[in-house]
Amino acid sequence: MRPWPEKLRQVLRHLAAARYYLPVELKPGQFPESEAQYQQFLHHTEFALALEELEGLGDENTGHAEEELFWSELALAAECMGLAEHSTRYWEKIKGLPK
């Protein structure tokens, strides 16, 4: 097994946590294969692509109790990957959530 740098492990933890905060039963949405695609990207360490799949799942599955936690974890993952535009977009989504 290859050693994983701490930064990659941290990104993986944030992405996994983000998925955890989505509903267990996802709405089928426009792209029903998104969750399987997300998992495939994780296993191939294509974390930026996994992040984008999760973003799509988050956009399709709104209004759940843990939505703020989902976007927070996604923002933290984006920050770890140096994706400032993504991170800013996710923090803005949190600001727009109903309180």
Residue ranges and their predicted role:
Residues M1-K99:
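C-terminal-biased regions
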